[in-house]
């Protein structure tokens, strides 16, 4: 049995590839030898820390009859699907834990990490933010996300809202959607630079579990426009950024999958986007600094202690 902790990803075409690299960095910073290997392709005799789609990974684990020490999941769930895996499950929010925990030995809630090395290359402190943020803004709104099955990440919705308001030229998006500027293949540093260049990050997901975390944008002082429900309400509590009230929760069947989704007021979303677009420089900088401080304190108080607890387990 090797002492090397191998980190696996289930998808190189989306955020899991980036997240796998981040786990490797955080483990090494805390004195644990770790290596990002790639996609899960065959059993090995080493320890495994799997970052993967909850269902695809479950099928693969059962097919190969293997046990992993840590299993990372943040996707949809088949409510009728019956399985049990003798592993620790790590999910990014209680929103996920409510759906998945009964299938695993133990469940931890741990939001995805911010790449602090990349953040420090862009903005080190509040004073730097005050001096540089406004003059570095190149566009008003940014959204990033790989859409699948339906507009789960809110990429199409963001575009439609901007179209209705006549400001679609102010939205920059990185996604697999054909109207977007680029497929999401940003490097870590490149991704944070894009966050910093945006005045606001638009995150209108119907069922967000923080697969691509809005904390990344917040870490460089970019406020988030978001629906105040599911994981957003859990972590932000409407205290930061520009929240949109949610109207209710439902189950959406797309093909053979059931998605837990929330609905929010589209008219209110338009009003908030208009308000953000017309915000004064003084008000914006105040919000940017509050966003930056919120993200920094949240990670210091919640993420790092929980990460250490999980590693000790």
Swiss-Prot record:
InterPro entries: Glyco_trans_1 (IPR001296). The keyword Endoplasmic reticulum does not apply. GO terms for molecular function: glycosyltransferase activity. It comes from the Viruses. Pfam families: Glycos_transf_1. Keywords: Glycosyltransferase, Transferase. Its EC number is 2.4.-.-. Transmembrane segments: none annotated. Belongs to the glycosyltransferase group 1 family. Glycosyltransferase 4 subfamily. This is Putative glycosyltransferase ORF313. It comes from Acidianus filamentous virus 1 (isolate United States/Yellowstone) (AFV-1).
């Amino acid at each position: 049995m090797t002492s090397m902790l191998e980190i696996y990803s289930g998808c190189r075409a989306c955020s899991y590839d980036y997240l796998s690299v981040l786990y490797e960095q955080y483990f090494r910073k805390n004195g644990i030898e770790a290596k990002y290997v790639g996609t899960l392709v065959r059993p090995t005799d080493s320890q495994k820390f799997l970052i993967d789609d909850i269902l695809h990974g479950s099928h693969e684990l059962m097919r190969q009859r293997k046990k992993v020490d840590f299993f990372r999941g943040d996707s949809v769930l088949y409510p009728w699907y019956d399985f049990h895996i003798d592993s620790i499950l790590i999910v990014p929010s209680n929103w996920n834990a409510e759906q998945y925990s009964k299938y695993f030995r133990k469940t931890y809630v741990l939001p995805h990490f911010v790449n602090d090395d990349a953040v420090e290359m862009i903005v080190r402190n509040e004073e730097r933010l005050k001096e540089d943020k406004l003059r570095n803004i190149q566009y008003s709104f940014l959204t990033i996300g790989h859409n699948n099955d339906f507009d789960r990440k809110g990429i199409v919705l963001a575009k439609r809202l901007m179209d209705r308001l006549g400001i679609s030229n102010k939205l920059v998006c990185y996604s697999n959607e054909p109207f977007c500027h680029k497929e999401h293949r940003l490097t870590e540093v490149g991704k944070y630079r894009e966050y910093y260049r945006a005045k606001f990050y638009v995150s209108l997901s119907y069922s967000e579990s923080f697969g691509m975390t809005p904390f990344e944008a917040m870490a460089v002082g970019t406020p988030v426009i978001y629906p105040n429900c599911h994981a957003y309400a859990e972590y932000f509590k409407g205290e930061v950024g520009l929240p949109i009230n949610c109207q209710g929760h439902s189950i959406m069947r797309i093909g053979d999958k059931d998605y837990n989704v929330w609905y929010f007021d589209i008219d209110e979303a338009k009003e908030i986007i208009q308000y953000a677009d017309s915000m004064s420089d003084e008000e914006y900088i105040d919000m940017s600094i509050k966003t930056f401080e919120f993200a920094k304190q949240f990670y210091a108080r919640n993420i790092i202690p929980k990460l250490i607890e999980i590693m000790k387990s």
